[in-house]
């Protein structure tokens, strides 16, 4: 019987080799792909997420755990597709035009993947047109806009207005160091997250 508790532990520790080995043997033993995902990988990332919120672990530990999850997911993805396991939701993310910062955005993308979302990461310095085009192409239910500078924050409002004018109905979340709940309300965003772990909670709430 596959030890999915040990798989969750391997993710928490960021032990890529063990995570991959347990995923391999679980698949070989015929464990359900959905169970490997939820009771192993997502369970481990959930623990990391809540520890991150409490400042018990920091960005390097989260990145190491996310990397272990990514390696295991590469093995698991074909089995999930075959079993018809759907993602929790489809999430499109990018840093707005004029802003080249990506650490926070990358962290949010990793945490969302860790929570079972299908994530399309557009990268940095993304204009409204690109967001519109990819939102349509991916049928994303959620769009995340990131900005790390007060000077690039207006790009969020511009992008939200453009998305709405183009008829994109996806829920829009914003975040980044200078961003606040007040600003999110002002520019008409559907959600705001102060950090990567909270972003997962907000995203889950918006797709529920």
What are these regions (language model features)?
Residues 1-81:
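Long amphipathic alpha-helical segments
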Residues 42, 97-99, 178:
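Short glycine-enriched loops at secondary-structure junctions
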Residues 58, 100-101, 152:
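Alpha-helix N-cap/loop-to-helix initiation residues
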Residues 80, 84-89:
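Immediate post-signal peptide segment of exported/extracytoplasmic ligand-binding proteins
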Residues 88-122:
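Glycine-rich active-site/cofactor-binding loop and its immediate structural neighborhood
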Residues 108-115, 120-189, 198-204:
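Cofactor-cradling patches in redox/metallo enzymes
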